[in-house]
């Protein structure tokens, strides 16, 4: 994947403002609420019976932070995303059996969360760069499935 200097700047500039704990928790909670079938991968998280329960669930919050922290590794390694996510791809494919479509769904939700939190900074050019990034990350995570 080729990144222009402008794309890199738009991605890293916005990433520097992201509260990983809050945005990660919100993104994962939205995934579980909007796409309830994804909850089956989180049965050990306890009460996911309603949006209120999901939003208040400390395990959702903690895992959301973990997910977005990993996403930060992509931002730091834009030129080597495939290798950055090789182990996570293996884990999600071989051990967790996560449908790779869920990576795309989470990427789309992350775009929504970023747009909501950073409306002024989230210009169409910024969105295009981030859309490219979430697509590349989703592809890297799905790599072991092929």
Swiss-Prot record:
Q: In which tissues is it expressed?
A: Red blood cells.
**Any idea which positions bind heme b?**
63, 92
In the record, biological process GO terms are: hydrogen peroxide catabolic process
Query: What GO annotations for molecular function exist for this entry?
Result: haptoglobin binding; heme binding; metal ion binding; organic acid binding; oxygen binding; oxygen carrier activity; peroxidase activity
Q: A Pfam family matched by this chain, by name?
A: Globin
**Which UniProt keywords are given for this protein, alphabetically ordered?**
Heme, Iron, Metal-binding, Oxygen transport, Transport
What does the entry list under GO cellular component?
A: blood microparticle; haptoglobin-hemoglobin complex; hemoglobin complex
**Domain Globin, first and last residues per copy:** 2-146
Name the domain of life. Answer: Eukaryota
Family statement: Belongs to the globin family.
Q: What does this protein do?
A: Involved in oxygen transport from the lung to the various peripheral tissues.
What is its quaternary makeup? Answer: Heterotetramer of two alpha chains and two beta chains.
What is the protein's name according to its record? Answer: Hemoglobin subunit beta
Q: Which organism is it from?
A: Branta canadensis (Canada goose)
In the UniProt record, what gene is named as encoding this protein? Answer: HBB
């Amino acid at each position: 994947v080729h990144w222009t200097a402008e794309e890199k700047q738009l991605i890293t500039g916005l990433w520097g403002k992201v509260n990983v704990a809050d945005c990660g928790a919100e993104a994962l909670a939205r995934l579980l609420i909007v796409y309830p079938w994804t909850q089956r991968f989180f049965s050990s998280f306890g009460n996911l019976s309603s949006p209120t329960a999901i939003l208040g669930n400390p395990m959702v919050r903690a895992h959301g932070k973990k997910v977005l922290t990993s996403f930060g590794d992509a931002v730091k390694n834009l030129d080597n995303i495939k290798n950055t996510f090789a182990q996570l791809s293996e884990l999600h494919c071989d051990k967790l059996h996560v449908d790779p479509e869920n990576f795309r769904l989470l990427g789309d939700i992350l775009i929504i969360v970023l747009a909501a939190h950073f409306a002024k900074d989230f210009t169409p050019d910024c969105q295009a760069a981030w859309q490219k990034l979430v697509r590349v990350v989703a592809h890297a995570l799905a790599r072991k499935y092929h």
